[in-house]
From Swiss-Prot:
May function in recognizing stalled ribosomes, interact with stem-loop structures in stalled mRNA molecules, and effect endonucleolytic cleavage of the mRNA. May play a role in the release non-functional ribosomes and degradation of damaged mRNAs. Has endoribonuclease activity. One of its GO terms (biological process) is nonfunctional rRNA decay. This is Protein pelota homolog. It is found in: Cytoplasm. It comes from Cenarchaeum symbiosum (strain A). Belongs to the eukaryotic release factor 1 family. Pelota subfamily. Coiled coil: none annotated. It holds the Pfam family eRF1_3. InterPro entries: eFR1_2_sf, eRF1_1_Pelota, eRF1_3, Pelota/DOM34_N, Pelota_arc, Ribosomal_eL30-like_sf, Transl-rel_pelota. The gene is pelA. Disulfide bonds: none annotated. One of its GO terms (molecular function) is metal ion binding.
Length: 343
């Protein structure tokens, strides 16, 4: 989340991924004012004729929120309410409108801030990592931001393999891979290169001569392409090279819960009902949730539950379904937690 404080009641934010959109959903409430860019049909009324269907134009509005909802399938946050201000004189104040917020959309929020709400927006997402899984046959490039994994591209080298002795120039393939990785890197991102054989080192050396972050070369990943990317995100090599990241922390919590379960300890919870009871007792130390929580509890109940758990001092982490971590939490009821004590 790109975050900037405007004044004591207003902030400007740009969500970067679905984790950020859900953080906004947890913060924005009825009565808050949200300003952003949107489209609206402007109808021309003519005497003795029906109004036409109107031309859809882009305007800036300030909306007093009445309802908020997530549309996970389309990756957007919908904010419905009444227009308080508009950049168009043809849009009447007080008329109803829905503002759709996608990743990359800039909005400003004006409200009476509750405890921890600003921190929730500032801390959403975490550092970004560009992951490159390469060998002599293919190169997979992805960007991991928080726990959201976005596959960027997969390049094929055109190598005939070991069975056929032909002259193959790997230089052009590596040049294309370095260029594609450079396009994926955003400000503040780290760059991690891995894969079988020595190709990863050749690519990392080539990247060092470009305006890119210093690439970290990781060993122990035996696959390239998309398979290599997904193998890396659930490996010990990921935790070593990304220690302190949100993804590494989520994987540590999942493994801690599984270890506690194997020892038949009472200091963990799985599923919405069990974890909600632990939250009501103030027992939660760290909590990981996935999209499955919304399916199990309902959207508003999930938001209230997470906000209440955070108010007791629990560490809250989302696990996106684009990664193995999110799928594992889905399979465990949509939410898991380590506990300070048995409730």
């Amino acid at each position: 989340m790109i975050y900037r404080k405007i004044d004591d009641r207003s902030v400007s934010v740009v969500p970067q991924n679905p984790d950020d959109l859900f953080a906004l959903r947890r913060v924005v409430r009825a009565g808050d004012r949200v300003a952003g860019s949107t489209t609206r049909a402007i109808r021309k009324e003519r005497e003795y004729a029906r109004p036409d269907r109107g031309e859809r134009v882009r305007i800036k509005i300030s909306l007093e929120v009445e309802a908020a909802s997530l549309d996970g399938m389309l990756g957007r946050l919908r904010l419905g309410g009444t227009i308080h201000e508009s950049s168009s004189e043809q849009v009447k104040r007080g008329s109803h409108h829905s503002l759709s917020v996608h990743a990359g959309d800039a909005i400003s929020i004006t409200k009476d801030w509750g405890p921890g709400e600003r921190k929730l927006l500032r801390g959403s997402g975490g550092q970004g990592f560009v992951l490159v899984a390469v060998d002599t046959s293919e190169c997979g490039i992805a960007r991991l931001h928080g726990t959201h994994l976005e596959m960027i591209t997969t390049l094929r080298s055109g190598s005939p393999g070991k069975r056929y002795k032909t002259s193959f120039n790997i230089g052009g393939y590596l040049e294309a891979a370095a260029a594609a990785a450079g396009l994926a890197v955003r400000k503040g991102d780290s760059l991690i290169v891995f894969g079988p054989g020595e190709t990863r080192k050749k690519l990392a050396n080539l990247m060092q001569g470009r305006r890119l972050p210093e690439p970290a070369v990781v060993e122990g990943i035996d696959s390239a392409g998309e398979d290599g990317i997904r193998l890396f995100t659930r490996s010990d090599a990921m935790r070593d090279s990304m220690s302190g990241s949100r993804m590494a922390r989520v994987m540590d919590i999942i493994d801690s819960v599984m270890l506690l379960a194997s020892k038949k300890s009472a200091k963990f919870s799985m599923g919405y009902a069990e974890t909600r009871a632990a939250a009501e007792a103030g027992a939660i130390e760290s909590l990981v949730f996935s999209d499955g929580l919304i399916s199990a509890a309902g959207e508003q109940q999930a938001v209230d539950f997470l906000n209440n758990a955070q108010a007791t001092g629990a560490g809250i982490f989302g696990a996106d379904s684009t990664t193995d971590a999110g799928l594992r939490v889905d399979g465990l009821g949509g939410v898991i937690a380590t506990l300070r004590f048995k409730p």
